[in-house]
Amino acid sequence: MTKQQIQGDRAEEIAFQLLQRKGWVLLDRNWSCRWGELDLVLQKDQRLLVVEVKGRTAQRHDRGGLDAFHSHKRRRLARAINCWRSHHPDAGHQLLQVVLALVNLSGSATRVRWLAIHQLS
């Protein structure tokens, strides 16, 4: 595994653990189709949560991962969500929320910034 893959896995695990403590149940992790990948898909009550995770260290200068979530990435994410829902028709009626988790991996105190995504395309 590359250093970036290790950082990405660590950031996803941190985001997942925080959400799990709040009662979210993991449905899929790193689910992929030809349109893209979904980092985390979780469920709580009758709600679905799709989380795009960006893990960064202090050396990166892309606003903590926010710059990496550009319009092309948002379109790919929207297509991947539609693909996931077509493979999980029982989840089609549930309210869907998409969030971006910006995980700061520098230092001993990990910080996560959560941003709700209201429009993907």
UniProtKB/Swiss-Prot annotation:
Pfam families: UPF0102
InterPro entries from the UniProt entry: Restrct_endonuc-II-like, tRNA_endonuc-like_dom_sf, UPF0102_YraN-like
GO molecular function: nucleic acid binding
Family membership noted in the UniProt record: Belongs to the UPF0102 family.
PANTHER family referenced in this protein's UniProt entry, alphabetically: UPF0102 PROTEIN YRAN (PTHR34039:SF1)
Name assigned to this protein: UPF0102 protein Syncc9902_1284
